[in-house]
Amino acid sequence: MKKITLLICLMLCGLFVVGGATASAAGKKPMDKEKAVNGLHDSFLFDKEELGELFDSGISYMELKKLCLHAYAAKKPVKEVAQLRDKYVWTRVDYLLGLTPEKLARAEHEYKVDRIHRLFGLDKKLVDKYMRMGYASHQVKRAMFLARHCDKSVEELLALKTRQQKWGDICEQLGLPRDACMK
């Protein structure tokens, strides 16, 4: 009897945990189509209509972003990569596209450097230099923006940024508004 009671209690607890997790996930809004399509177009320069069709087909934003990266790296149309992905797992898709981890990483690096240059007008060679030093593209962008407002070099600003030290805090230490690294 005790075992049955314990088993029922565990099952009920499991239902509450699963139900609660589902409810919180259900409250999460999906990515707005226009925002998703515009963002991916700005990043990868693929056709907005084509991206919209793929988004409408039920592909999640993150999956579509991954499709774009692979298409960019392989220099193939996004729809062609999406058709491969419908049939195969990513490792097989990469093989069929001739993408090695190194080629994919190189293409991702190139796309990020190009994107920052196109969208923010930052020097491509400098962005590339700092990203090759292991800094994330958003850190490089913010340090380059911030360097315009103070007497510190980009290298010095990147050195100030740690996981604990936020960009807004660095701006304040330099006597600048918290958002100085954003423009």
Task: Locate the predicted segments by residue.
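Positively charged n-region of N-terminal signal peptides that target proteins for export
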Residues: M1-L6
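A broad, structure-centric signal for solvent-exposed, well-ordered loop/edge residues
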Residues: L7-I8, A71
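Bacterial N-terminal signal peptides
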Residues: I8-V17
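Short, intrinsically disordered, low-complexity terminal segments
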Residues: V18-A23
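General marker for long, soluble alpha-helical cores
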Residues: S24-K183
